[in-house]
Amino acid sequence: MVSQFLHWYEYNKPVPYRSLLQEKIEPGQTLIVKGSTIDESQRFTINLHSKSADFSGNDVPLHISVRFDEGKVVMNTFANGEWGKEERKSLPIKKGDSFDIRIRAHDDRFQIVIDQKEFKDYEHRLPLTSITHLSIDGDLYLNHVHWGGKYYPVPYESGIASGFPIDKTLLIFGTVEKKAKRFNINLLRRNGDIALHFNPRFDEKAVIRNALAANEWGNEEREGKMPFEKGVGFDLAIKNEAYAFQIFVNGERFTSFAHRQDPNDISGLQIQGDIELTGIQIQ
């Protein structure tokens, strides 16, 4: 069944921010931090801690320091009372801009993504299981934080235990493969019909929307620019409303698709093609 993506999701948080993780971080899970800066911003940090959300001497498996004053992002680990060797990269964020930083845990490394683009792989220097707390501090406005997800197979198919009735939203977090040609997302009816076929085609530079009823496809809809990029992450939201699905890509409305059958008769999800999935949620 479609699993809950989020272990927590918090909006407009005060800074400094401190949080105890309710569960151990598992490989495949992603921490998403979204916020904004001001023209006077100098630095801010994101830290994954062991035992306490401070720098009182306990280990810090991952320290990310965004330094506008140096034009760098500095990554490091504090272990056994000492800082290790810094890893530095040029800063892709400008002062005054909003930002989206994602940290995905793997068995051997953290995969760091900034504004939906690959930024840095940081090899673990301490066990992933030692992480218990998160802190965020510095010159930023923290809009929201969430953490969850897992490894998903593609093709992916799942039932939706609670259904997908009107007023619910399906969120899909993923990354388009660098050599992608196509991917598709299907919302399935109980009888096997497809209520919504959402099919970005890079080879045609179009996003096809359609529905399948009694083994026959209806009329294709393909208006609108391609909102996805090869090799770049995306957040896709599909909201089931009374007369149509409203579809958003990266927080911006992309299109609507008028229902062609009962909007309350959706019981399954299929995802296929040239993408990597990082999270699926219905809210």
From Swiss-Prot:
Keywords: Lectin, Membrane, Repeat. GO terms for cellular component: membrane. CDD domains: GLECT (cd00070). Residues 17-148, 156-283 form the Galectin domain. Binds galactose. Exerts immunomodulatory effects on host peripheral blood mononuclear cells to down-regulate host immune response. Hemagglutinates human, dog, rabbit, chicken and mouse erythrocytes but does not hemagglutinate the erythrocytes of goat, its natural host. PROSITE patterns: GALECTIN (PS51304). The keyword Repeat applies. A beta-D-galactoside binds at W217, G218, N219, E220, E221, R222, E223. One of its GO terms (molecular function) is carbohydrate binding. InterPro entries: ConA-like_dom_sf (IPR013320), Galectin-like (IPR044156), Galectin_CRD (IPR001079). Coiled coil: none annotated. This is 32 kDa beta-galactoside-binding lectin. It is found in: Membrane. SMART domains: Gal-bind_lectin, GLECT. SUPFAM superfamilies: Concanavalin A-like lectins/glucanases. It comes from the Eukaryota. Pfam families: Gal-bind_lectin. One of its GO terms (biological process) is regulation of mononuclear cell proliferation. (Microbial infection) Interacts (via domain galectin 2) with goat TMEM147. Interacts (via domain galectin 1) with goat TMEM63A.
